[in-house]
């Protein structure tokens, strides 16, 4: 159903007063008011749509949806989507073409109806020359203002069409068109009140309506004020011939139009007239601009004389009102005979076909509009009518609101008689007519009053037949009259309408021209271009046919006037257009330029902001870095200050510590005793636990054996009742086959005997047979009773087992939950304890590092005081070294004890694991036996074998998971033990140098940790055992449950079988039982064989696993033994080396005495003979003495020389760069040949590195010497006396002295040369200072090592026959063997140097052995082999692989980073003092040999002291 009935006024501007005066004044009849009730009755009579119409409606609706058209313009939805539309009316006169194009646009904004204003106001306002208000939306598209029409289907028959139409013709009344005051275009809209709120598209199909021509058009139909001048002169130029009076009042006959219908059906058409109106809605009027009339001429009188009819389906004469139709459905209509039809020529821009949605447009180039508007062209074809009466037409003016509400229908018929006279001026040509389709649809029909509609249709069709006849007569008369008129004015206007440009009309009729006839050729030349561009192909043909006629004076004057006016107007419009276009272009260019400038400015501003931000960030970063550096420096100063204070406090408490050392030792001994006691208690506790575990296992074993025995007895009793031979097979598995054969043979004999007896019994009398049957029956009853008793006993036993299993399961669940809760609590407590310990360890580490730094700084502050108290400190140092050696020895003993304890714990753990494994194996075996016993009872289940296999697989999986879990727990326990061990060692190292209270606290903490660890291990073991027991119990309960279900099922089956067996014959039952027994026995034998095979396989598998575990354990034990053996061998080797060194030391001391005496003699002689120093001789002498002293130093035993290494820290720490250093001045020699001591700032600070020369018979001095060479403990790292971070090798700069080769001494056979090689480091040899020196020399030499490494072989020979061949040290080759004490001093020096070289060879060989196999490490010397730092990392990885991880994947590219990492790891985790600074090494072109030897010697000592 359609919702609304549209009605509005076409708003056009009023004509000027002059034009109104020229037009004849005619009265305007008031509009007829139609009440609301009458309108409701009329709308209720509309018929309902049929199925065919609904299908067409769907099709049209789809087309409109595809063309972006909305539903109903009358139902508050604009079908044009608020787009502009174009309606065109074109009239062709004679052979010329006159086209009138009307274009109007409407905005998107809709105005409400004037609901409260009565329709009579329209008449009053119109009579006063004012514009009436619009009763409908003020902004509607022009296509909505044209007419609502619909298309019908030509295939529908006439009867259906008559039946479908209802209640519309009753609204038609005769009306005449007022030519001057055309009040409105009347548009009727209907609404069915039942479905007025529907939002559907209610218009099934549009239909085009034909419209007749009219030769008169009021100027005021156009809303554009700019077009007023066009129509002012038009009325005077158009001739309006008069018509006879009898034709004015002839009724108009409505005829059907083929394929058109008001409501979309196929049988009926309904038309609404288009009336030109002076007043139309604001912003919704038809807008005709002058541009539209430049291409085709327009005849106003012809348009005003147009009439509107309803056409029947059978009518051949078609009248088309201005209407929009689809291009695909536009078909020319054949006019009746002798009737001229004016053709509408349309031109459509193909480029706008998509926007026009398939409608024909007359605009060749439509005006540009906004994107929200569309362009719609309307094509009109009108036919001539005899008069202008509207007797059967739609009422003139109607108003209604959207709700069908308060306003009544009204109409104003046009009765102007003069309008008919204008039809004489209209001529038509028999060209093809074109119909167009409107996209305005009316809704569906009502379903009410169908019978009344049929009756009313019959009356309408009778009236239409009469109208048809009258129309034919009128057409004939009109055709004749038009033909005469055409002949009269054909020659006059032939050339006038050749062009399509509209002319501006004047207010007066032009007079006849007296000028000469216009030259046609000149006119054609002047206007041919505009005519060719404006007209269509058909119009050109018509114009060419009519160019032959000669114009008159009247037409010439008219043409001249029109030509001038048109030419001026066209030029003005072209100028305006060009100017507007130029302005638009300029504006666009300006906008583009401004946009580019704006974008460039924005980009510039953004770049500046970004640059400022970056600069600010950079400055802020620099400021922050500077602040951090200041904070760091302030922090360092504060730390130095605190360190000084702490050093003072430590020095004050030093005496107190010495006093408390003895007490600490007593407490340590007590602690050791307490530790041993705790270990003993722990062992006792473990022994008790082991005994309790053994007792528990024994008890469980006894219980299980008892249960097994009872079960076996029960099974044996059952088997004895059925068959005695089966018991022998079960008890003696090895003789199973043999006994089975015997049993089968026995059964065969029994059967044979029974058969024989039976045969004999049959031969006997019948009494014997009856007796035998009676005996058989009694036997069967006894067996049945025994079987029932057995089943009852089994049932009771099963119920008891079920109850016990349920109780066990509940208890197990409770225990499991408790254990889980306790485990979670323990885990949380352990995590907290671990975090606490980690935090404490980190704090202690930081404190130790700070303490170390403080000690370093304190050494510098104590420099002056230590100089004054050198002798006292020396004595204290000796005591301290002795005490440290004692502490180290005790620590070593403690470490050995701890190692033994750990080994014992490991053995205990392995023993416990072995016991646990055996217990689990035993439990598994017992479980397997129980499973086998249960399996034997399941004799009749064929699928039992598969189920048991699945259970065994599941049990194996659970066992595997349990073992993995135990292994994981073991690994965690081992890691925890290792971590505890490391923590304990670190605490012990810190406790060695701490106070008494600290030592006691750490001992207590250690005891507590040990106790917690033991408790943790115990808890873990208990939890593991509980979890394993719980898993086994759960598994056993599940199996028992499955067994109960299976037994219940078997019992049910047994009962059924017994019921069946009772029905069978007794004899056959006995035979079947015997067969069943034999078969069951055979199956049992097979199952038993399979079980034995499976058991054998399981045992073999367990044996293999046990063997593998034993092999692993054996390998571990062997490795441990090898390690212990290696350590013993190393210890023995060290002892031998120590003995050898002691012997060498004795010899060296003897040589040293003699050598000193000779030196003193030589020096005295030189002082007497020489007063001036000869540089060359002095340098050579100093070098020789330095070599001798260095050899003596390096010839010390391992234990003795190691103490000197720690005192050489001044060689590397705090060294400044050699580059740019100011060369020192040469110092004068004293009388004794030494330099001035006060000019050597570090000479006093160097601690003597040689031992005291004892007397030959002084045993006490020998003992003191041996104590001096003892190793210091790792925990306490003391700096040497007089240590200063800025100290160097006593501030000697090799670049300050130009070394020269000296002459060989005459008394030596040793060749001493100074060689240099490119890219080799400079080496420095320090002068060893004796405790009781007689002569002090500072010697230096500069040599380069050979490219080949020294000999790595170390051969120990007796002292009397030992020789050192092929040794090299610092580039000085020596082949001189050792000589007895009577040899000259030069030979003694050479022998001492060879001994020193042998010590370096030992160190080098040890380093090679430790780094063997490491990729990228090849140690050949003490310089170039260590340059990249990888060798240091290899040493750290050798003794602590966990610190570095995988050696192959570890990055080793950065040299300085390798130095820092290796030195820090060695100091922190191995206890090797970092004598070498990585930053100083980075500045040197190569390694410094002596510094590297010092560090590596310290590394060697620490590793040997640690037992590696």
Swiss-Prot record:
Keywords: Coiled coil. Residues 380-391, 439-452, 1362-1374 have a biased composition (Polar residues). The keyword Zinc does not apply. This is Calponin homology domain-containing protein DDB_G0272472. Residues 208-222, 337-346, 362-371, 465-498, 1036-1164, 1226-1235 have a biased composition (Basic and acidic residues). Residues 455-498 form a coiled coil. Residues 1-165, 197-290, 309-518, 531-561, 680-706, 1036-1391 are annotated as: Disordered. InterPro entries: CH_dom, CH_dom_sf. The keyword Acyltransferase does not apply. Residues 81-107, 234-251, 263-290, 315-332, 395-438, 500-516, 531-557, 1165-1181, 1189-1206, 1333-1355 have a biased composition (Low complexity). Residues 1397-1504 form the Calponin-homology (CH) domain. It comes from the Eukaryota. Pfam families: CH (PF00307). Residues 1216-1225 have a biased composition (Basic residues).
